[in-house]
């Protein structure tokens, strides 16, 4: 059962104006570096920390373990999107795994997160489902076997999907769609409230006409996060129609969304965004039926473009989806 989050993540919480200004600078710098063409080598590789641990984990599995949690790279389970599911039956804390295998699983999770992001996700797992030991993993493909499709580690459970794929799927950030959340109904106590605050700064920068264009009544279904490509139509206001200062706020929101993850994935995500036409091709929508605190800080919002879907559903608690790629997995 979820309980109130009161500690465990020292850097989580409200986003101060000073922090947001610093984030804006980081976002502008990051997107500028994409334009310089310096991110071609930015994606994770088989030698990245998380992927190295995942390969070691695979090598440690017995044949009986492989029959339960190891699949071909193109298995349908790798493509499923859900905010609450067990990709395989054993939990990390089960006797199914050895203590050394649990250490390796933790190393993968540390490897795909930033320092703050790791603290958040561990607190999230504790609050939402009793901790890291209650989540599930699967392995797809085999390490070093690129000719068979690739190799990917995936962790799932309540409000969480994380992946490490060593760029097995070129042009797809994070190895495919990822999920995060928090089962707390008070927005200001949600672990990812800083993302709502960042989006709210965009909304509060809009003039009356822009606010009408950005405001939508009913949100799309929760799992509507597949990439639509350049032929897609997107809800809300087009970011390219906003002022430069407003676009910087959108960039800062993107950087806030990406902040929990490792630098390699962040850089690849920004590269993919650039390849899709950049931030100006995105639309941003705010779903005004969702206002938990009755404060006109909209709890559900969406950033979407040809290569990007960030869908944050903060009501009745957080279910959030991030899908960044030149194609769907």
What feature does the model see in each segment?
Residues 1-19, 28, 33:
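N-terminal secretory signal peptides
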Residues 44-63, 67-114, 119-329:
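A cross-kingdom marker for long, charged
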Residues 40-42:
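Boundary at the C-terminal end of the N-terminal hydrophobic targeting segment
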